[in-house]
Structures are given as structure tokens and as C-alpha cells.
Amino acid sequence: MSAAVWQDGEDIILKLYIQPKASRDKIVGLHGEELKIAITAPPVDGKANAHLTK
């Protein structure tokens, strides 16, 4: 597994880099040692966090 994803017992840990206000939601790929996720929600009032957890 890469440094962005690893297993800890029964848990899988993801190290994420989130890009808010993207043109569409998608998994972009690796960004250094993090998995880059693009989301359409803006980083205002927790909207990006709420969108990511859907």
C-alpha cells in the first residue's frame, strides 16, 4: 500500500488532500503522499466537509 492508504488492524486509513470548488467530484490520484479528492462544494460553513462525507 502507498503512504496515502494503509491498514491499522481492521481499519483502513486514508490520508486525503481535498480540493474544494472543483468543476466536478472525482478522485484525482496521488498528491505527494496523499490521495487527492476534488469536490464541487465550497469551503464555507462546513459545506465541503458535509459534501465529502456523503
UniProtKB/Swiss-Prot annotation:
Disulfide bonds: none annotated. InterPro entries: DUF167, YggU-like_sf. SUPFAM superfamilies: YggU-like. Pfam families: DUF167 (PF02594). Belongs to the UPF0235 family. This is UPF0235 protein in proC 3'region.
